[in-house]
Swiss-Prot record:
Residues binding Mn(2+) 2: D283, H288, H336
Subcellular location per the Swiss-Prot or TrEMBL entry: Cytoplasm
EC code: 5.4.2.7
UniProt protein name: Phosphopentomutase
Recorded metabolic or biological pathway in which this protein acts: Carbohydrate degradation; 2-deoxy-D-ribose 1-phosphate degradation; D-glyceraldehyde 3-phosphate and acetaldehyde from 2-deoxy-alpha-D-ribose 1-phosphate: step 1/2
Keyword DNA-binding attributed: no
Cofactor: binding comment: Binds 2 manganese ions.
Lineage: Bacteria, Pseudomonadati, Myxococcota, Myxococcia, Myxococcales
Main location per the UniProt record: cytoplasm
Catalytic activity: 2-deoxy-alpha-D-ribose 1-phosphate = 2-deoxy-D-ribose 5-phosphate; alpha-D-ribose 1-phosphate = D-ribose 5-phosphate
The species this protein was found in: Anaeromyxobacter sp. (strain K)
Requisite cofactors: Mn(2+)
Keywords, alphabetical: Cytoplasm, Isomerase, Manganese, Metal-binding
Physiological role: Isomerase that catalyzes the conversion of deoxy-ribose 1-phosphate (dRib-1-P) and ribose 1-phosphate (Rib-1-P) to deoxy-ribose 5-phosphate (dRib-5-P) and ribose 5-phosphate (Rib-5-P), respectively.
Amino acid sequence: MNRRLVILVADSAGCGALPDAAAYGDAGSDTLGNTSRAVGGLSLPVLGRMGLGHVTAIQGVPPDPAPTAFHGRMAERSEGKDTTTGHWEMMGVVLRQGLRTFPGGFPPEIVEAFVRETGAPGVLGNTVASGTVIIQELGEEHQRTGKPIVYTSADSVFQVAAHTDTVPLETLYAWCRTARRILDPWRVARVIARPFVGAPGKYARTYDRKDFSMPPPATTVLERLVEAGVPVVGVGKIPDIFDRRGITEEIHTAGNADGLARTAALLDRVDRGLVFVNLVDFDMLYGHRNDPAGYARALEELDRALPAILDRLGPGDLLALTADHGCDPTTPSTDHSREHVPLLVYAPGRGGGDLGTRTTFADLGATVAEYFGVRSDVGTSFLAEVTR
């Protein structure tokens, strides 16, 4: 009997450039492979035994001749290389038109509407920036004037940063809800609240970030599961990404270690349904900051935490580990990279095998749909291959 399926998304842990990566400025990107070489090798015994070394060339993680999980990689069919696009495609929504980006900052009509409708005293920034850098550059002026820091990136995001002593958290969230409504017609994927704390020169972002996503333009596999009475637990930023559609329970997390511990605890009480987990630290703390050493430590932390999750799985359960895009910390860019993503599928007691290169992330959603007996419109299920 199919009971529980766990998806762990190692946010940004791509495994090699897609054929069209050059068009995105990402030729040669390989988040996992390049990170391993930058640090002189990774120690990932659990992931190695699962077959991660078959997915791309990872220094320190050779291909295991008898992997314990099924291994492969997935290519993104949608245009883009961001969190929203990647997660939506995983759950059966392929975007034919990329989401809107603003490489020159946001036009006056957006900024003026934001200021007018929120009552904010203006904005600072309105540029493409690294979030950790711009709060150091503008944080003191923000605290003096009360103006929030607005910025974007190569992704379709409108980010609003504010010090929690200057703009209360709930006020920041309210401003972002207003921005979400303003930006819906502009096809901006996410409005992100970026609270920070600290003193000038030592500002630090908190885990109270909140994403306000535009709703998916089509029905996702998650919604079909809920309609069929299947519980769906969203861990980390999963509920935000899907605008809380197709989610029956939300679990907030404070980083990867917390998310992994909460996932293990969930498996002690959840006896049926989908547990969908996003592990954001790879992307937020290390990929965007071009920190391969930190990225390597996070991968090794994941490896150490996996046994507590795998040991809680029983006959009929499945676990899939994947990513939503790349964010190669070894390249000059601090933005996401257009990459394949790894696919490891663990079925207790069934050994492993090669799932090849899937032509869309939606193959994962199609597999989830078949596992729980609901319809999917996009992708090819590999359920038979991992349960034979």
